[in-house]
Amino acid sequence: EVYNSLIFNEDENNPMFIRLKELIDEIFNNKDNDEYVKNIIFKDNIEEYNKLRKIHYRKEEVYKLKKVLSDNSPYVIEFTGTPRTGKTSLINNLKDFFKKKGFVVEILEEFTTSEKYKKEIYPTLKYKYKNVVNTEIPKYVLKQLEESVERKPDIIIIDRSLFDRLIWVDRLYLKNGMSENEYSEYKKLYIPLIKNKIDIIISTYTDSLTSLKRDYNANLSLEKRSFLNETNLNEYNESLLNMKKLSEEENINFNLFDTTNKNQREISFEVVDCLLKDMRQNLLNKAYKEFDFK
C-alpha cells in the first residue's frame, strides 16, 4: 500500500509516505548541494574540495559508530599551547565541523579568563601565595569538566584545562615557586585525572618571537604587552615541552602541532585528521568491548 502510494501518489497524507518522500528529497537535495559546492564553490580548487570530502566522510563514519553504541560518554578534547597559535580559531572551526553533522558539542571556555573566575574566584585568591593559586585553580577546572561530562554531550572541547595547569605548575616549580615535594605530589594527583578524564590533548606551538610578531600584526596597539613578552613565552614553552616529554613517559595522549611555518588552514586539516583517527579508534575499542568481538 505504501509502495503504491509512493509510486502513484495516491495518498499524499499517509505519514509513512510523507516520511519516505522527505528522505528521498533529502538525498537528492544533498546531491544537488554537493554538485553545487564542487562545481561552483570549489570550481578553481578541486584539490581542496577533495580534502574536505575525505574528512567529511570520515566524520560521518565516526558519527555512525557513535550512534550504534550504548556508551554515551563524551569524547573530551583539551586545547593548550603557546599564545597566538590559532587555538581559539581551531576550537570554533571544530565546533562548527562537528555540530553541522549532528554531534552535540559543548565548549568550555578558558577558566582563568572567564567572568566566574574574575568575579568570584580571583578575589579570594589574589592575596595568597602563587602555589595556592596554581593548586586551587585546578580544583575549579576539574569541577567545570565534571559538570560538563554529567550533561552528556557527544563532544567536549576545553580551552585550557587540567593539562594546561600542569604546564603552569611546572613553570612555577622551575621558578622556585614550589618545592620539589609539592611538585611531585601535584603530578601524583593530577596525571591520573588527566589520563582518566581527557581523551586527547591538542597543543599548538610556536617560538616566542613568532608569537609576539603575530600579536602585534593582529592588533593596532604598539604598547608593551602585560604578559606577552619573550621571557614569559620562553618560560611557558619550556614547560610545555617538558610536559610533552612527561606525556611520553606517562602515556598521556598528547599531540603537538608546530604552527611556526604553517597557516591556519594547514593546521586545521592536521588537527582534524588527528582527532578523527583517535575518535574512530576510541569508538572501535568501545564497540569491541560492548559487542564482545573476538
Label every PLM stretch briefly.
Residues F79:
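Hydrophobic anchor at the beta1->P-loop junction of P-loop NTPases
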